[in-house]
Amino acid sequence: MNLPTAQEVQGLMARYIELVDVGDIEAIVQMYADDATVEDPFGQPPIHGREQIAAFYRQGLGGGKVRACLTGPVRASHNGCGAMPFRVEMVWNGQPCALDVIDVMRFDEHGRIQTMQAYWSEVNLSVREPQ
């Protein structure tokens, strides 16, 4: 099988953001290959396999309402890889916050996420006014 096309990568990554926005943890986890790795944020020890990835998303998304939206177009290559800028809005330590992130993903020949690296740190976190 071939790797996803650039257009398919764009669609897959946009779908990922949609699923994060609605908090569909099971559907997010199903987007990953069985042996996938997640580095979130990049530089932390990788999380390996769907079971650990599911626990990571349950911890991160299961505690409250999280919103996510793209803040620019998905950039995709012809080798099954892509990058996207997006914003996550959440409540952190009782304070409404926004986190600006860039995710880099590599997909396998089945269109599943093989690797995901999230680029962010505390310098990308901003306090929002309560709504």
From Swiss-Prot:
InterPro entries according to UniProt: Ketosteroid_isomerase, NTF2-like_dom_sf, SnoaL-like
Phenotype for Y57S: Reduces activity 100-fold
Keyword Lipid metabolism: yes
Transmembrane segments: none
Pfam (any one): SnoaL_2
UniProt keyword list: Isomerase, Lipid metabolism, Steroid metabolism
Binding of substrate, residues: D103
UniProt subunit comment: Homodimer.
The name this protein goes by in its record: Steroid Delta-isomerase
Organism listed in the record: Pseudomonas putida
